[in-house]
């Protein structure tokens, strides 16, 4: 039989973690002063007058560089538990991790050839 009382802690955590941000937004909305003016609408740059436009558009190559970084950062997250339990796991898990790394190396070579890693 499926017992719902086993998940009471989960539901309590879910409710509390949902109520706290909602309360924070409600309290700040009620207590915050509403003073609209030119000072509020201007952008802030370390206490000095802003030079140029506040909204700059980044080139797409920065996004591609960041995307390649995120892919290999996630690779590290996936390989860390495997490295910590390497002595307990068998050879088959080593082969699986090797295949995983080889697939990522193929992706790196592909990104390199497409010019995603070119900075200039």
UniProtKB/Swiss-Prot annotation:
GO molecular function: NADH dehydrogenase (ubiquinone) activity; quinone binding
Key words, A-Z: Chloroplast, Membrane, NAD, NADP, Plastid, Plastoquinone, Quinone, Thylakoid, Translocase, Transmembrane, Transmembrane helix, Transport
Chief subcellular location: plastid
Localisation per UniProt entry: Plastid, Chloroplast thylakoid membrane
Gene3D superfamilies attached to this UniProt entry: NADH:ubiquinone/plastoquinone oxidoreductase, chain 3 (1.20.58.1610)
Keyword Membrane: yes
Pfam families registered for this protein in UniProt: Oxidored_q4
Membrane-spanning segments: 9-29, 64-84, 88-108
GO cellular component term, pick one: NADH dehydrogenase complex
Biological process per Gene Ontology, one example term: photosynthesis, light reaction
EC number(s) from the headed UniProt entry: 7.1.1.-
Entry membrane topology: Multi-pass membrane protein
Catalytic activity: a plastoquinone + NADH + (n+1) H(+)(in) = a plastoquinol + NAD(+) + n H(+)(out); a plastoquinone + NADPH + (n+1) H(+)(in) = a plastoquinol + NADP(+) + n H(+)(out)
Subunit record text: NDH is composed of at least 16 different subunits, 5 of which are encoded in the nucleus.
Family: Belongs to the complex I subunit 3 family.
Function: NDH shuttles electrons from NAD(P)H:plastoquinone, via FMN and iron-sulfur (Fe-S) centers, to quinones in the photosynthetic chain and possibly in a chloroplast respiratory chain. The immediate electron acceptor for the enzyme in this species is believed to be plastoquinone. Couples the redox reaction to proton translocation, and thus conserves the redox energy in a proton gradient.
HAMAP family per the UniProt record, alphabetical: NDH1_NuoA
Name of the protein in question: NAD(P)H-quinone oxidoreductase subunit 3, chloroplastic
Phylogenetic classification of the source organism: Eukaryota, Viridiplantae, Streptophyta, Embryophyta, Tracheophyta
């Amino acid at each position: 039989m499926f017992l719902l009382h086993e998940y009471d802690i989960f539901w309590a955590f879910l409710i509390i973690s949902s109520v706290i941000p909602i309360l924070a937004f409600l309290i700040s909305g009620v207590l915050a002063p509403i003073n609209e003016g030119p000072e509020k609408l201007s952008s802030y740059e370390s206490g000095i007058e802003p030079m140029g436009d506040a909204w700059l558009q980044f080139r797409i190559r920065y996004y591609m560089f960041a995307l390649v970084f995120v892919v290999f950062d996630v690779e590290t997250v996936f390989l860390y538990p495997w490295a910590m339990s390497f002595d307990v796991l068998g050879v088959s898990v080593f082969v699986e991790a090797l295949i995983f790394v080889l697939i990522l190396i193929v992706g790196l070579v592909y990104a390199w050839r497409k010019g995603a890693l070119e900075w200039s």
